[in-house]
Amino acid sequence: MVRNIVSRLCSQLFALPSSSLQERDPCSVTEYSGLATAVSSCKNIVLNGFQVPTGKQLDLSSLQNDSTVTFKGTTTFATTADNDFNPIVISGSNITITGASGHVIDGNGQAYWDGKGSNSNSNQKPDHFIVVQKTTGNSKITNLNIQNWPVHCFDITGSSQLTISGLILDNRAGDKPNAKSGSLPAAHNTDGFDISSSDHVTLDNNHVYNQDDCVAVTSGTNIVVSNMYCSGGHGLSIGSVGGKSDNVVDGVQFLSSQVVNSQNGCRIKSNSGATGTINNVTYQNIALTNISTYGVDVQQDYLNGGPTGKPTNGVKISNIKFIKVTGTVASSAQDWFILCGDGSCSGFTFSGNAITGGGKTSSCNYPTNTCPS
């Protein structure tokens, strides 16, 4: 009897450390409370599908150099009604943010959507879901499945040598009206990728389903956007440029991408009455399908509340190439719309373009009053 009791006690004693060590692995996070410890002490972090509480960030801004973070399961976010709140923040050097098979990052957009996006003062909501700031050193964000973000999805700022690839951004749940939006789509201002004040950023092979710009570069240099699939939004955009702390765009390539069921295909927009520079931008091998407003749109009369119809020339737009932009727009749309300020556009090149279907006559005031065919 005594021997059996001692034997059982010994087996339990020796079993405890192994189980305890598994439960206490600081690098495998199963609830929000373990996140800070993992970020400070680990270089290979696994986030195992937990809810981020109200008012708390999924803070990955202090990752060690060369860290890898892998999302598993379903990561969700409790409601935080605050325009200045960023649910996810990422920063680091030579870091990798990725997702395991079957994972989902759900931004809880349904709790916020009201058809107004960032234009509502009474119904506050996080303006950017994921902020990638000062991320450098050949860092990578890959293979993430993100859905239902409240307003803008990615804000990429102050970063360099960064590649984002293989992402699926899916906000189609916001296409239909809800009780707050009346007849409007519930989701609004839901840009996929906003890029500012960054250098050598590459977006490749990403799918975006949303209700605003698929990609919007408002400032930055040496940006490459390739093999994108953009559906439901406002297309591949430069701008709006002007009136911000950084108003220089120089060296952007949009390559081999599809824009479908969207308001615009290729768009360059500068803010009315503002100053800045847009230089050396190429749209090449862009396929358009069922564009509802403009196949190609260059306008210098932009305001968030709507264009003024009177272009200004404070933002200089130069060395712009449209090469093999092809496809169809809706019968209610215009194939081309170019509205430049007095003397502020120069060096546009058009080659191999074929945009058809627009029932409204194209309108261009540069380089001549005749639009490209």
From Swiss-Prot:
Q: What is its EC number?
A: 3.2.1.15
Q: Name any GO cellular component annotation.
A: extracellular region
Under Gene3D superfamilies, the record lists:
Single-stranded right-handed beta-helix, Pectin lyase-like
PbH1 repeat spans: 136-158, 159-197, 198-219, 220-240, 249-270, 278-300, 312-333, 345-369
Q: What are the catalytic residues? A: 212, 234
Q: Which residues are glycosylated?
A: 65, 94, 280, 290
Q: What SMART domains does the record tag this protein with?
A: PbH1
- Cite the GO molecular-function annotations of the record: polygalacturonase activity
Q: Which Pfam families match?
A: Glyco_hydro_28
Q: Which family does it belong to?
A: Belongs to the glycosyl hydrolase 28 family.
User: What InterPro entries has UniProt attached to this entry?
Assistant: Glyco_hydro_28 (IPR000743), Glycosyl_hydrlase_28 (IPR050434), PbH1 (IPR006626), Pectin_lyas_fold (IPR012334), Pectin_lyase_fold/virulence (IPR011050)
Q: Which UniProt keywords apply?
A: Cell wall biogenesis/degradation, Disulfide bond, Glycoprotein, Glycosidase, Hydrolase, Repeat, Secreted, Signal, Zymogen
Gene of this entry: PGA
Can you name this protein?
Polygalacturonase
What are the subcellular locations of this protein? Answer: Secreted
Stretch forming the signal peptide = 1-24
Q: Which residues form a coiled coil?
A: none
What does this gene product do? Answer: Involved in maceration and soft-rotting of plant tissue. Hydrolyzes the 1,4-alpha glycosidic bonds of de-esterified pectate in the smooth region of the plant cell wall.
What happens on changing residue 267 to A?
Loss of activity. Lowers affinity for substrate over 10-fold
One biological process term in Gene Ontology: cell wall organization
User: Which positions form S-S bridges?
Assistant: 27-42, 214-230, 340-345, 364-371
The reaction(s) annotated as catalysed by this protein in its Swiss-Prot or TrEMBL entry are:
(1,4-alpha-D-galacturonosyl)n+m + H2O = (1,4-alpha-D-galacturonosyl)n + (1,4-alpha-D-galacturonosyl)m
Q: What is its main location?
A: secreted
